Amino acid sequence: MASLLQDQLTTDQDLLLMQEGMPMRKVRSKSWKKLRYFRLQNDGMTVWHARQARGSAKPSFSISDVDTIRNGHDSELLRSLAEELPLEQGFTVVFHGRRSNLDLVANSVEEAQMWMRGLQLLVDLVTSMDHQERLDQWLSDWFQRGDKNQDGKMSFQEVQRLLHLMNVEMDQEYAFSLFQAADTSQSGTLEGEEFVQFYKALTKRAEVQELFESFSADGQKLTLLEFLDFLREEQKERDCTSELALELIDHYEPSDSGKLRHVLSMDGFLSYLCSKDGDIFNPACLPIYQDMTQPLNHYFICSSHNTYLVGDQLCGQSSVEGYIRALKRGCRCVEVDVWDGPSGEPVVYHGHTLTSRILFKDVVATVAQYAFQTSDYPVILSLETHCSWEQQQTMARHLTEILGEQLLSTTLDGVLPTQLPSPEELRRRILVKGKKLTLEEDLEYEEEEAEPELEESELALESQFETEPEPQEQNLQSKDKKKKSKPILCPALSSLVIYLKSVSFRSFTHSKEHYHFYEISSFSETKAERLIKEAGNEFVQHNTWQLSRVYPSGLRTDSSNYNPQELWNAGCQMVAMNMQTAGLEMDICDGHFRQNGGCGYVLKPDFLRDIQSSFHPERPISPFKAQTLLIQVISGQQLPKVDKTKEGSIVDPLVKVQIFGVRLDTARQETNYVENNGFNPYWGETLCFRVLVPELAMLRFVVMDYDWKSRNDFIGQYTLPWTCMQQGYRHIHLLSKVGISLRPASIFVYICIQEDLEGDES
C-alpha cells in the first residue's frame, strides 16, 4: 500500500498540484482569517503551511490524524461568514479525537475541489493500510524528517540526529557499527532499502526472538504444528484448529515459499504478534456480538451531557459540532437544552450562562444527518425544555418535519407494550426523552429534576430543610409562586414522547408503587453516588426495570468528568459524560464502549438484569467467581517523546496498570522506570491483581515519563473491559491523551487469568 501511495503521488493530478502548494485562507473565527500557504509533503503523509510562499514552513497536520473532509456548506463557521467568503470555495478538515476542525477557503472552487478530492484519496489510502504498510509509511516519514538536506540520503550525522528524534539513546560506536552494516553500497550514506535494514537492526526484538525459538525446533521457522502448540498453550486459544492456524500463517507470513510450506518465519511471527489477532483486545468483541433483542433498560447506553458545548459550562462555545462528534463516536443519547429564541425560533445553550447559542432546528438537522453514520441502533434526544407554549410548538414541528420517518412518534406496531422495546426493534429510530402529559395531569407540569449549578450546596440546603420544615403558609405561597413561573407543556411536543417519559425521583419505593417501565428519572452524580452507598441493591433492582440517567455535578463548570464505572456498577444505563473533555474518565468510557461494534449499547451482566438480584456494588458477595490476573510487562516499542520541542530529551518510561470496577476491585500498580529509552525499553516485571467481579472490571494501561522533580508526564494509554481481554503474549497499541492512535507505539505484555477455586480465599 505504501508503494500504491507513492504511485498516486507521482501520477494523480490533484496530489501533484497539492505538492506544489498554494495559498488558502485559514479561518478560526469571524475575526481571525489569515492567508497561509499550504503544501502536501513529498511523503504524502503530512501537510505543511507557511506565512509566505517561500517562508519557513511547519507541520499543519498528518493525514493519519484526519477523519474526513467536509465541504464549506457543512461548516458552521464558514456558513456564518457566507456573505464574506464563498461557501463553494471552502472546506473543512475534520480530525480524529478532540482536535479542533481546520476551516480553509481556497482562491477558487476548482482549487477547493482539488484539495478535497486529494485529501480524501489520501485518507482512504491510509485507512486501508495494514500493520506492515503503516510501518513502511512510518519509516518513510522518519527518513524524510532525518534527511535534513533532502538529498534522498542519510549521513551518519543525520542518523545520530534522527536517533534522538526517535527517542533512542545509543552508544555512538554501536550506532556506527549498525550504520556501516546497513551501508551495503559503502557510500557513507544510507538510501531507501539500506535505511530499512538499519531500522530492522535497530529494532531487533530479542524477547520475541527468544519466544520464537522456544517453540521452533530449528530456531528458523515455526511449523504448522509448532505454531498451533503456541496458540493453544501460550495464547490460551484452546479451540484453535489447524485450519485457523493455517489461515494465520497465510495472512502474516511475508514469503511465498513459507506460505507454500505452511511455516511461519520470525518476521511472520512478529507480524502476527503486532496485528489485531495478537492484540490484547479480543477481535471477537469488536463486531456486534451481544444479544440486541433485550429491553433498552438491559443495556449500558453511551450518553453525552450538554452535547452542544465544545468548551466549559459558563462561557464555552455552543456548536452543532458537539453533536457531530458525539454521534460519530457512537454516542446514542445526546442532550438538548432548549430556550426561547428571537424571531420565534428556539435556541440551544446552557441557560443563565454566557455560552453562545445555536438554533434548535440546526441541532435537529445535524442529528438527522449524523445519527446513524456510526451505529444503526436508536438515538435518544434528551430534551430539557424551558420554552413557551408557542416555541414548544415550533420544536414539535421541527422534530416532525426534519426527522421524518426517523422519529418514533407512536408505539411499535401501535401495540400497547409491557416492556421497553429492544435496540434491534428500534434500529435507525430517534426517540424523544422528555416530559409527557397524561390524563391525570393538567397542562402545568413540574420540571424534571434540574441540573443545578451548585448541586452540593443545594443538597446541603435540602438536608437542612428536612429537619427544619418551612411554615405551612410560607410553603404554600412558595408553591403558588413556583407554579405560576412554570411553563405550560405543549401537547404537540408531549405527544412525541413515547417510551421515555421523564419523571422526578422520590424514592425507590415510590417508583415501584407509582411509576411505569416507560418512565425515566435523572440523578445528579452526587445523589446517585449517595444512593449507591445507602441503598445499592435497591438501585440495582430499580435499574432492572426502569431507565436511569446520571449527569455531572453543576459544580463541574470546567466540563470535567466523574468516573462512570461507579454508576455502571449499580446498573445505571445512561451515564452522561462531558465528551469534549479528555482524561481518565473518558478513557474508561471510550474503552467500555469500544466493544460490541462501538454501537453505543453494551449488554449489562446478568446480575444487573435480574429483578430479584441481590447484588450490592459496595458489598459484592458470591456467586461471583473471583479471578487473579498476572501481567508481565515485557517491553515497549517506539514510544513518542513527551516534549517534541526538546530535541535531546529522551523519556524514562514506566507502565502503570489500573483496575476500575466495584470499589473492592479498584487497584493500581506500576513498574520501575527505564532510563533514557523510549524506543525499545525493557521491563520484564510481573504485576498481580485479584478481582472479585470481573464482569464489571476495566483495565487501563498507562505509559508515563518518570520525572523525579515533578509529576510524571503522560505518554499514552489504552483502556479495555476485562471481558474483552485476550490472554497470552499480546501487544497493547497506545492512544494519545485525546484518543488518537500513536502507532507504532505499543507495549508488549504476557497476560494470564486464573479463576479462583471455589472457597479458595488465598
UniProtKB/Swiss-Prot annotation:
Residues binding Ca(2+) 4: 650, 652, 676
Residues covered by the PH domain: 16-124
Entry keyword set: Calcium, Cytoplasm, Endoplasmic reticulum, Hydrolase, Lipid degradation, Lipid metabolism, Membrane, Metal-binding, Nucleus, Phosphoprotein, Repeat, Transducer
Phosphoserine, modified sites: 457
Record remark on domains: The PDZ-binding motif mediates the interaction with GRIP1.
Requisite cofactors: Ca(2+)
Domain (PI-PLC X-box) ranges: 290-435
Protein name (record): 1-phosphatidylinositol 4,5-bisphosphate phosphodiesterase delta-4
GO molecular function: calcium ion binding; G-protein alpha-subunit binding; phosphatidylinositol-4,5-bisphosphate phospholipase C activity
Domain C2 per the UniProt entry, residue ranges: 609-736
Binding site for Ca(2+) 2: 183, 185, 187, 189, 194
Binding-site list for Ca(2+) 1: 147, 149, 151, 153, 158
Domain called PI-PLC Y-box: residue spans: 493-609
Assembly and interaction partners: Interacts with GRIP1. Interacts (via GBA motif) with guanine nucleotide-binding protein G(i) alpha subunit GNAI3 (inactive GDP-bound form); low-affinity interaction.
Positions with a binding annotation for Ca(2+) 3: 306, 335, 337, 384
Species this protein is from: Pongo abelii (Sumatran orangutan)
Residues reported in the UniProt entry to bind substrate: 433, 435, 522, 549
Catalytic residue positions: 305, 350
Gene Ontology annotations of biological process type: intracellular signal transduction; lipid catabolic process
Gene Ontology, cellular component aspect: endoplasmic reticulum; nucleus; plasma membrane
